[in-house]
């Protein structure tokens, strides 16, 4: 597994596999020297991820693929951050959490170069209903002035914990499937790219450093990751101005915590939102607030 990865992925594999971590650089690219040391005949699967919409270096992917021919391991490709940039590269299997991209209460996708067979699965209706309730409460808090912040956050936390412990596979809900069919993917791509370009052009604060400046034509950003020395103070400052940002990820295992790059990212990285809900006026407001941070 990549050393910089969320706890839910580690937990998923830890139950049945011995995990070895390979290192990433500060721009979240795979360190070739590190993965070279890890891949041998004992490896049954290699998990790769493309972070924040930026694809891993093609030469590294080619190297992993060449090693696969020698050692016959499977490649699992996490496209949760990159599915709109590119659906697949070298993976035998791809996985993506669609609810990270779209305003839906549930839904993910598993796809493969191989034919997949699955048992008949049903919806998890109770959980979906609670998440829909939380989404509505969040909207009322953000846009209607309703004092329900603690209420919606409590539901989200409870449902995320339940999802982490879930063993059974459920079908995507009918409401999420319907909402996905209503999405204009081309418009979403254009909006995200436009917002990324505006932030990159207008950000002017030496305390807030973009993780990278990606300019490739096919790149569709997941969010706008930045590094800030006083990340927690910066996040609180943004919240005071109604800008809510995600942080990634607390490191859980001893091996992960011993890697310097991991801890620097965990302590200092934050994602500025730029998804399709927001237009250039929103970006202008956010960048003005960010630039005023002292």
Residue ranges, per PLM feature:
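PLP-dependent aminotransferase-like
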Residues: 1-72, 76, 82
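A charged, well-structured terminal subsegment
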Residues: 108, 115-118
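Structural detector of well-ordered beta-strand residues that form the stable sheet scaffold
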Residues: 20, 76-78, 95, 211, ...
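Short, acidic/turn-prone active-site loops that include or flank metal/cofactor-
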Residues: 4, 23-28, 81, 98-102, ...
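PLP-dependent aminotransferase class I/II
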Residues: 5, 47, 118-294
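Conserved active-site segment immediately N-terminal to the catalytic lysine
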Residues: 74-111
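Short glycine-/acidic-enriched loop or helix-start segments at secondary-structure transitions
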Residues: 9-11, 31, 57-58, 85-87, ...
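Short, well-ordered alpha-helix to beta-strand connector turns
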Residues: 16-17, 43, 91-92, 105, ...
């Amino acid at each position: 597994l990549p050393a910089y990865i969320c706890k839910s992925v580690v937990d998923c594999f830890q139950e049945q596999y011995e995990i070895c971590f390979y290192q990433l650089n500060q721009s979240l690219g795979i360190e070739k020297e590190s993965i070279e040391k890890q891949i041998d005949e004992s490896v049954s699967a290699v998990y790769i991820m493309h972070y924040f919409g930026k694809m891993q270096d093609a030469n590294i992917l080619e190297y992993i693929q060449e090693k696969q021919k020698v050692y016959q391991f499977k490649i699992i490709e996490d496209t949760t951050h990159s599915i709109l940039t590119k659906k697949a590269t070298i993976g035998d299997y791809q996985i993506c959490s669609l609810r990270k991209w779209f305003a839906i209460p549930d839904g993910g996708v598993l796809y493969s170069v191989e034919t997949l067979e699955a048992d008949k699965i049903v919806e998890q209706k109770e959980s979906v209903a609670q998440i829909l309730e939380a989404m509505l409460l969040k909207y009322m808090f953000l846009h209607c002035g309703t004092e329900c912040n603690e209420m919606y956050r409590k539901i989200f936390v409870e449902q995320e914990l339940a999802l982490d412990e879930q063993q059974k596979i459920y079908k995507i809900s009918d409401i999420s499937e319907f909402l996905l069919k209503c999405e204009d993917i081309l418009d979403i791509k254009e909006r995200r790219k436009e917002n990324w370009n505006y932030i990159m052009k207008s950000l002017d604060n030496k305390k807030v450093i973009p993780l990278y400046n990606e300019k490739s034509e096919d790149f569709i950003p997941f969010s706008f990751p930045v590094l800030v020395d006083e990340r927690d103070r910066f996040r609180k400052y943004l919240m005071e101005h109604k800008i809510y940002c995600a942080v990634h990820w607390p490191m859980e295992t001893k091996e992960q915590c011993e890697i310097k790059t991991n801890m620097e990212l965990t302590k200092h990285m934050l994602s500025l939102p730029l998804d399709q809900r927001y237009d250039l006026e929103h970006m202008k407001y956010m960048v003005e607030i960010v630039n005023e941070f002292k």
